[in-house]
A protein has these predicted regions:
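Short, exposed beta-strand "edge-strand" segments with a Pro/Gly-rich flavor and a Y/T-containing core
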Residues: 4, 16-23, 214-220
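Glycine-centered secondary-structure boundary/capping sites
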Residues: 7, 95-96, 113, 143, ...
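Compositionally biased, intrinsically disordered low-complexity regions
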Residues: 9, 180-184, 197, 244
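Residue-level detector of functional hotspots within protein domains
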Residues: 11-14, 106, 133, 203, ...
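Short glycine/proline- and acidic residue-enriched helix-loop micro-motifs
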Residues: 11-18, 189-193
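Glycine-rich phosphate/ribose-binding loops and adjacent secondary-structure elements
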Residues: 16-187
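C-terminal extensions of enzymes
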Residues: 188-247
């Protein structure tokens, strides 16, 4: 079904895809410009999503210098992020932790006095161990303007895949719970209303917990970049992220 939509029948589609024809930041910006123009006359923002890697900071720096300032956000996805359409070897062994690359991007913007010009969003493993609010708080203190969730929301819809037993049927069209499929025999298995309510309840709980974490540091708004609110017992982590070391 996806092959037909993209006009490439009987072709293996890899995830994440490579963007053939884009070899420079200038070409990427041009693609964003064309996408923005196509998206209802520049009324819809277009953001960049980048895997956390050695080149993340370079990409972000180039976007900061874009004279047209058309990038609506920079999404960094860490190694703990997941997609059911990827090979397990890619899921387990490629990418960097989002924490360090997020911090590098934020500090790069600070050094240029451009923090906040392009909002930073962090994801990849947020809430994976049941601590979404705490994870979000740490990311925001390290410089993120917000976080994004993926796998955990799909699980709230009823996805049966998890870290202990991956389903990995997302790209096959045979999703057993009816989420990632167009097959009418499977779609009916998804209870949309119940799944939506699960997500609403989860996000409201996350919001409440995040407010409780912000209260002790005296913030009523998101503490973007307030690394002084964080400490670590690992000296290497303290040195890398520029936060306080305690023992």
């Amino acid at each position: 079904h996806i092959q037909a939509i993209r006009g490439v029948p009987r072709t293996t589609l890899h995830s994440p895809p490579n963007h053939q024809g884009l070899y420079s930041i200038e070409e990427s910006v041009q693609k964003m410009h064309l996408s923005l123009n196509a998206a209802f006359g520049f009324r819809v923002p277009v953001a960049i999503k980048c895997a956390a890697s050695a080149t993340s900071v370079s990409v972000y720096n180039n976007l900061l210098r874009d004279p047209y300032k058309i990038c609506g956000g920079f999404f960094i996805d860490g190694i703990q992020g997941g997609t059911g359409a990827a090979n397990e070897v890619s899921l387990d062994h490629t990418g960097h932790p989002v924490v360090s690359k997020l911090r590098d991007c934020y500090l790069a913007a600070v050094r240029q006095g451009l923090q906040g010009q392009i909002p930073l969003w962090a994801g990849g493993g947020i809430g994976m161990t049941g601590t979404a609010a705490a994870d979000a708080f740490k990311m925001i203190c390290l410089g993120a303007n917000g976080v994004f969730l993926g796998k955990i929301l799909i699980q709230l819809l009823g996805c049966v895949g998890n870290e202990q037993g991956r389903c990995n049927a997302c790209s096959t069209g045979r999703c057993p719970t009816g989420i990632c499929t167009q097959d009418p025999r499977l779609v009916h298995r998804l209870d949309v209303d119940r799944g939506a309510q699960n997500i609403v309840d989860y996000m409201l709980a996350l919001d409440g917990e995040l407010r409780k974490l912000m209260a002790p540091i005296g913030n009523s708004s998101l503490p973007v970049g307030r690394s002084d609110a964080l400490v670590t017992t690992d000296r290497a982590v303290a040195d890398k992220l520029g936060i306080q070391y305690v023992c």
